[in-house]
Amino acid sequence: MKRKETYLSRDFRETAALRFPAQAKELNTAFDMRLSALLAENAGASKEKQYHLKRQILPGIAAYETLQRAMPKEEALQTVHGYVERLARTSHKQLAALLHIPGLYRLVPGVFVKSTRSVFGLAAGFAPKELQTGNGVWRVDMMKCPYHDTCAEYGCPELCRCFCDSDDISYTGLHPKLIWERSMTLGRGNDRCDFCMEVR
């Protein structure tokens, strides 16, 4: 069965074709083999965790490692950061456009409460500590995160910052009355991610 392409694998192939045409085939094969190995090693993870592993974490690791065959490590990191950033900017644009609907911004913290519980919960490898989830406020400390844990496990903790940054790009400045705040993240070396989205 053919594996579904993620935005990361698509962007990786584009980089290989445009920047390293002579090595593109070899790089694509190396990427596919590494991703297959990573998926096999993590096959026992829960369905909830697989959602994050398959969509972002493992393709990110495979792309980062494979790019280092053709460019310096720091450049490979910036390249993957660019992939993640591009998706985050698109997502920001779509969300901001949606929030032009009068009053819709008020619902955002509540949506974050629901999605944290369903997609970013214990079953997916996260450990959210809810501090405030009502009255237009979503305030959660994330004590454990599979993005951070998996990147660290595979020897590339620095890659996690790409995903941390993507949150800030996606959610900062969505609406004048909606405030996104986070001063710490596990991926940037802190002991938690202190998430907050509130209506002001």
Question: What function would you assign to each model-found segment?
Answer:
Residues M1-L67:
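N-terminal, charged low-complexity regulatory/assembly segments
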Residues R3, F126-E130, L178-W180:
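Generic structural motif
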Residues G136-D141, P146-T150, Y154-R200:
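C-terminal non-catalytic interaction appendages of large macromolecular assemblies
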Residues A24, E75, L178-I179:
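Secondary-structure boundary/capping signal
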Residues R55, T66-G155, L159:
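Amphipathic interaction/junction segments at domain boundaries or subunit interfaces
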